[in-house]
C-alpha cells in the first residue's frame, strides 16, 4: 500500500522540521529515523514517481484491453534484451520446518533451514502466511527476527501487516533482517491480534499457522551471485547496516507486483531503488561524487528549503546504471526503453 500525497508531504515536512531543528550541515548525513514500515511505504511511493518521471508519464497507463497471451509472448521474445534476463540470479522458496507456540498463546516462532549465502547477495525477501477462515477478517500481524535460539533475548522488528480477508498474505521483509546462524537456521517470531472491536483474543483459535498441511508458511527469497570484484566495491561503498554511521548505500528492492503495476510493466519483475546516506567526516570529504537525482528526492527537498553551509560534504551517488523496461503504453503498445541513471551502484562524499 503506497502513501497518499498528503501522507508523503507530511513525512517530508516532518523531516524538514527535524533537519532545521538539528541544523545538520548535510541533508543526507543523518536523516530522521522512520519505522521499517514507514520507510518501506516511502520507498514504494518514491519508486512510483521515479518510474513515471523516467518514462515521461504523468500517470500510469490504464490497461483496458490486455494483449492476447500469444501476441504478448512473441513481442517479449523479440524485444527483451539479453541484459534484462538476470544472470546468476535465483529464486529460493523455503518452507517453515517447525512452529514453536510455547512462548505465548498468540505468538509463534517459525524456523527455516537456509543454506548460508556467503557467495550470494540476498536482495528481496517475502514471508507468505495463510490466514484460515476461522479467524477474524481483520488481523494485525507483526514479524520479528530472533537473535537467540528461542527468541527470548533481543529481537528485531521486521514488518507489520493488516489482513482484511482470509487466505494467503505476503509480507515484504528487509533482507538485512534475515541473517541466519552458521548452521543455516533462521527464526522469525509472529505476533497477531484482532482489529475487529467485536472480536477478543479469548475467542481466537490458538493455531494461526500450521506446518503439517497445505498452508505451510514459506519464505520467497531472491538472490544473485556476487560478481568478481564485488568485495572491493563493497569496501568502497558498504551497504548500510543499522550500526553504520558513515556514507553508505541503502538498498531497497521494489517488486512491481507490490506496487500493483505488473499489468503494464512486463519486464523486469522489479528493480533496486538504492540511495546514499550517512556521515562524511572531513577526511572523506572530496571523494568523487555526482549530483544526486530523483532517488534522493527527500534530501533534495530538504536542501532546497534550508541554506546549507558552503563547502559541506554530502554522501551522494558516484556510480549509477540505467534500467531496461518493457511496458505497455497508454495505447496498449509494447515499448522497450532504457531509463538512464535509475540504479545507484556506489556512493561517496562530495
Curated annotation (Swiss-Prot):
Any one Gene Ontology BP term: negative regulation of adipose tissue development
Disulfide-linked positions: 240-248, 247-315, 276-347, 280-349
InterPro entries reported in the protein's UniProt record: Cystine-knot_cytokine (IPR029034), Inhibin_betaC (IPR001318), TGF-b_C (IPR001839), TGF-beta-rel (IPR015615), TGFb_CS (IPR017948)
GO annotations of cellular component type: extracellular space
Pfam family, one: TGF_beta
Protein name per UniProt: Inhibin beta E chain
Assembly and oligomerization: Homodimeric or heterodimeric through association with alpha and beta subunits, linked by one or more disulfide bonds. Inhibins are heterodimers of one alpha and one beta subunit. Activins are homo- or heterodimers of beta subunits only.
Taxonomic lineage: Eukaryota, Metazoa, Chordata, Craniata, Vertebrata
